[in-house]
Amino acid sequence: MGIHVISICAILAIIPLYWLPVLPDLQTVWMLIAAGIALSLRQKKWLTFSGLAVLFLCWGFLAAQESVWPMNHLTKGPQQAEVVITATDGATMHQGKIVSLNGERVWANMGVALYGNYLPQNVCVGQRWAMTLRLRAVHGELNDGGYDSQKNAFARHQTLSGRFTHAAIVDERCSLRSQYLTSLQNTLSAYQWGPLILGLGMGERLSVSREIKDLMRETGTMHLMAISGLHIALAASAVWLLARGIQFFLPGRWIIWQMPLLAGLLFAAFYAWLTGLQPPALRTVIALVVLAALKMSGRQWSPWQVWLTCVAAILIFDPLAVLSQSLALSAFAVAALIFWYQWLPLPSWQRSRGLRPLATLVYLQVGMLLLLLPLQVLIFHGFSVSSLVANLFAVPLVTFISVPLILLGMFLHLFPVAALESIVWLTADKSLAGLFWLLMRLPNGWQDVDERWQYLTLLPWLLIIGWRFRAFSAVPAVCLAGSVVLAFPLWHRDKTDSWSLHMLDVGQGLAMVIERHGKAILYDTGLAWPGGDSAQQLIIPWLRWHHLSPEGVILSHEHLDHAGGLASLKTAWPAMWIRSPLAWAGHLPCFRGQRWQWQGLTFTAHWPPENTAAKGNNRSCVVKIDDGEQSVLLTGDIEAQAELGMLSHRWRQLASTLIQVPHHGSNTSSSTPLLQRVEGQVSLASMARYNAWRFPSKKVVRLYRTEGYQWLDTPQSGQISVTFSHHSRHIRRLREHYLPRWYHQWFGAPVDNG
């Protein structure tokens, strides 16, 4: 049985972990293992392959069960644990690995994020602490097309977070890597591009400024920042060359051809450890081990066989890597390169000696730009049109000048040669200064792409395949029909009588989108925090991905969990109108009795009165949206006192099909008279699962259900979308209906709040 066949079995068996809605229980897994062993011992090849695939699938199930176990068993009360610090900001944010529980050794990879507390003495990576922990399971916001933090946590084996109530040092020694990194940081603090040198050499990107990261994203050069195959392969190649050079002076009987290969491999592993064994670096080492083993086998392997074996080895080593975006990008990029050069090789007329390096580099970048489009658009919702030009000088400069200098500087830092080391660091600093001087002269090349184009991004692949098989002349009708199908989302139009309400999952805040005829307005804009807000992180990307430009915003009130993203939205769409009860400059009024039309929908403000003395929550702008048959009542953070005041004025007009739960489901809102007068059928609530106020109140949830409402909230469902059409409505809950994955479940305590 060929190794490539085993690799295919492993890949096809583990990939379903990405889509499975639930994990089988352990009893089922053991039954499957027995069946897999029985099948793999059969004589017929297809039965043997099936048995191997079942065994690899069970290996993935066991890895997933191992990652889920801590969340369901360690979040029920205080835990006595020993934790090894793996990362820290030196203050209140720490990452660690649990190595023992209640005095017993833990072999599973249990990562934990600790926050909010200072440790009783100076902390550094590598220290071992005895702690009393209060842990909780990972739970992330989930929006259509948004960043999936919960999936990423599983891929990083970081599924627990929490606080420590007691901590005592067990071993205060810092790791060798931590000592080396601290020394290196002190040395590089004198250089302008020191943070970037640390990022390129050690993978420490926290100190790289946001402006630099944005510039690299806009120019398509962000991939150069990761400690990946480029850096580690360069380091391994340098050691391989050094070992070959040493062999030149040795007697022939002492020369073993495998030694340079093994030396390079060992140094690659050492360098990956030095950079913190980040997932991309660890995967590169695994791939290099596979490559070395294949090389020493004495057989000739095709590029596709090598690719399959490397990917399979990575997934067997860590089945949850199938959830990793970085692995998907790396594997897809290598596959695209193989495909590009095999199916569309560089024309021979371009291979003149003088033009060959430039032609090869341009050809490489064109291939990467075209063939990586499907994954770029799917993950990042766009691509950089300036990446072709930027990478033409950035890749050679970083690969052949900056990174070798940084590696040399890191090596010299181990020895007392300060003068020589400073020359190397200065040269590396100047090379990066030159690189970013050039990058800053390029126009902002980032191009947002909405979801309608994601199928058309497959065209470069399909055109190359069609050209090689002469499909355009053999079956032109099929090619034309295929293009029409790929472009279907561009010319398809939804029913004209429908409209949608989207409650975005923004955590402890509120942001709702009203959509009709390809237009949108927002009710509230999410929350803000130091250095960012919901609009930058979530709302603006969501709107652009869904091809929506907001025409206006209804702002319920001024609190930061509702108005936090307003400035960012206004920057993105300056012509957007704002309606609020705040009487701020440029705001249209939103007071009781006002009425307006938008896209055939009627908006009526029911609170506050124009001359109210109320402030904060009780001045929330309450708006009813009506299409003539069904309606929605948006209530902001209105509390019981204001609810009763609103009911005293034309309460019959408040009847609605759906209500947005006031004040995130707090005890101070959602009075019984309001729920009875609204007479609704569905209630939508927005909050974070782990919020400081323990919303929603159990009493409030029970009240809604008693009054006949269907209760839906963002922690349980993620983004909630309701589509209204003639005499009907359709509710889509992202976590349960559209992305029902085992890693999206509610882990830990069944109910956290109340």
Language model region names:
Residues 56-223, 533, 537-541, 545-549, ...:
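Membrane-interface helix/helix-cap signal primarily in integral membrane proteins
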Residues 266-273, 289-296, 312-320, 373-377, ...:
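Alpha-helical transmembrane segments of multipass membrane proteins
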Residues 155-287, 293, 631-636, 640, ...:
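Aromatic-rich juxtamembrane segments at the membrane interface
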Residues 22, 272-281, 296-300, 317-327, ...:
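Membrane-interface helix caps and helix-loop-helix hairpins in membrane proteins
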Residues 257-265, 299-315, 348-360:
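Short hydrophobic alpha-helices at membrane interfaces in multi-pass membrane enzymes
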Residues 1-72, 76-82, 243-255, 259, ...:
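Transmembrane helix-bundle segments that form internal channels/tunnels in multi-pass membrane proteins
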Residues 232-251, 288-295, 334-344, 405-409, ...:
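Membrane-interfacial alpha-helical segments at the cytosolic side of multi-pass membrane proteins
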Residues 118-132, 158, 351-354, 410-754:
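Non-globular, low-confidence helical/coil segments that flank catalytic cores
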